[in-house]
Amino acid sequence: MKVGVIETHHSHPIIPSVVVQDTSEDPGLIEKGENRFARQWYLPGAFAQYNINNNSNKDEEKKKKKEKKSKSENKKDGERQKNKEKKEKHKNKDKKKGKEEEKKKDIFIIDPAGNMYYNWLFCITMPVMYNWTMIIARACFDELQNDYLAVWFIVDYVSDVIYIADMFVRTRTGYLEQGLLVKEEQKLKEKYKSSLQFKLDFLSIIPTDLLYFKLGLNYPELRINRLLRVARMFEFFQRTETRTNYPNIFRISNLVMYIVIIIHWNACVYYSISKAIGFGADTWVYPNTSHPEFARLTRKYVYSLYWSTLTLTTIGETPPPVRDSEYFFVVVDFLVGVLIFATIVGNVGSMISNMNAARAEFQAKIDAIKQYMHFRNVSKDMEKRVIKWFDYLWTNKKAVDEREVLKYLPDKLRAEIAINVHLETLKKVRIFADCEAGLLVELVLKLQPQVYSPGDYICRKGDIGREMYIIKEGKLAVVADDGVTQFVVLSDGSYFGEISILNIKGSKAGNRRTANIRSIGYSDLFCLSKDDLMEALTEYPDAKAMLEEKGKQILMKDGLLDIEVANLGSDPKDLEEKVAYMEGSMDRLQTKFARLLAEYDAAQQKLKKRLTQIEKILKPVMEQEFLDFEEADPPTDKPGVTKTE
């Protein structure tokens, strides 16, 4: 209960009255000075001096305040959670938008180096070739246009659809930028629109066919703008030339096609001129079509083609021209024939010579060997063996020097080709089975192909082993000293000589061959020399130790290892080899240093000459500027000296 003094309004001695208010219902209304449920009574005067508070009401007020705070806090927490949820929703939406934008950016792109693009080039080449051959023919030969009108309309508009699709394909064809394939749609469209090809493509699909409604259907030359898409045909031929395994044959076929198209166009123009002058008007034009034999469409085209071929190739005789226009046309034909066919025939000749270049070079080697053997009086049997060996190389297409061919490739591609061809073969060798990949790659690049004739000895017993061999193709026999008795026959994938090139200490055979190995027929082998192996092992000391350990184990199994010698310290020969290698390295370094010093001296002399020339040019200029400076600023009087009047 809260007691407050409400009012005093008597003039006589004041007896204050006290109004007792029950504020348990709502303490907030008391603070505002109002209470809907006020219960008031007046207390006698002495109590009017005091405000009376009920403790229970205070506790209730505190509880209610706490409840309000908790409610407000709960509301705030709820709002915070809602805000978080909204933010998360916005983030998810942004992520989805970003993914959608990425999907839009990373649209389906055609790789210009892929098969899909090449196949599309073939598809677009067909309508281009159709337009280049049939539009001119239909325009000149009326029967050809009128008799097959429905067919021409179908093929024309199918080719137009392919033309339009080709423009879409161009907007989806990627291109390389800084070595990466561009896949952004906007960039692809902008690049295509800014190119000359877009303008030509756009002109080639302008619907000039609409003029049919005005001029009639007998004017197929209205579609002449379709010929502007010829660049696609050239691109297809270029890519086919790089893809085919027979490029020379393709080039010749391509040139023949160009010749036929030129003759075809010239024949159509000849028939058109004859029609304009009048059939049978003179001896030069096409004969009169009133004759049934010359009225046939086939005869018209074949006769014109025959005349065009004779004129452009300048072979045979044609009827002489009569009118001025006929003379002019024949002169132009002769000039075109001379220029075009001279170029084409020259190209064909160079292609044929290139096709025979390999054979000519190979034949030159054989001729040189024959002359040498004849000059040195080599026996006929040996001469026959040499010629048979050359014949085997040419017949089996092994006359090409692999190193000469692969030298034009970068080291990385050369290594990949060598790995693809030789790595599996090298892994079959026991001592190289567990070697690291880097060493195997080094060794693969050092394998040298060799071909042996029947009866050739690859190695003889007691020879110093400087190479190891891997059989690629053929059969070798381990024979006795008589060369006839065969102990073992080695076939494809076999190898020998791997221990001798390691020069293992304690080997009872040293680095000598322990058997005679002879080729039974023609054999293809890969050879790895000791020097190449040691050069590769200098960068792989752990691999070298592992190979020597494997070699020792193989020798121990065969009983060819002296363990006491093997357990001794380093061999003096090894130290000598190392010293010799160091001396060679020092010599190479000295040579390089001397070359660098000479280059430095030459560069220093050039700089001195240039400085001298600069001084000569600038010296008079500097002197003139110094004189001008002295004239502009004359010397002043010395300080402390005054002039007397």
From Swiss-Prot:
Q: Which InterPro entries match?
A: CLZ_dom, CNG_cation_channel, cNMP-bd_CS, cNMP-bd_dom, cNMP-bd_dom_sf, Ion_trans_dom, RmlC-like_jellyroll
Q: Where in the cell is it found?
A: Membrane
Q: Where is the composition biased (Basic and acidic residues)?
A: 70-86
SMART domains the UniProt entry points to: cNMP (SM00100)
One GO CC annotation: plasma membrane
Keyword entries, A-Z: cAMP, cAMP-binding, Ion channel, Ion transport, Ligand-gated ion channel, Membrane, Nucleotide-binding, Sensory transduction, Transmembrane, Transmembrane helix, Transport, Vision
Question: Which named protein is this?
Answer: Cyclic nucleotide-gated channel rod photoreceptor subunit alpha
Q: From what organism does this protein derive? A: Gallus gallus (Chicken)
The uppermost taxa in this organism's lineage are:
Eukaryota, Metazoa, Chordata, Craniata, Vertebrata
